[in-house]
């Protein structure tokens, strides 16, 4: 198979993947009206391996190539741009790479199908407390937060020295 053609076998097979795309296309207005991708679509993304695609094999992931991942995202985005965004943004290894290994192990302790969401801007203040950090603020949006397993947030730089390496 040419490298520039999406291999649907990597994503649950042609029948499953095409049915997902058809369902996404049919429900675009619903997603727009609700201002979110429905939970059942996020679950189907998990089933076909969207969120474990780039997770290293040592953590139970599929460790697919970036090209394979992006071709899948492109197909979903062609069906609905917001669904493509939630599929691509929910992929978490890129965001977790900066964390200490023991934190990454905790995130994937129950399996690689972890859905990431983020409300990064504007950064908000964080304070060290027993057992972690207290983050207080309001983020204007958090892409994919309704279907997320883990939510990353931006913290203000005024606390950098206190929070480094955590």
Per-region residue spans from a language model:
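Generic structural motif
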Residues: 53, 156-158
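Alpha-helical interface subdomain recognition
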Residues: 1-71
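Fold-independent oxyanion-binding glycine-rich loops
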Residues: 138, 155-156
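Glycine-rich flavin
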Residues: 39-47, 52-149
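Conserved small/polar residues in nucleotide/adenosyl-binding loops
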Residues: 158-165
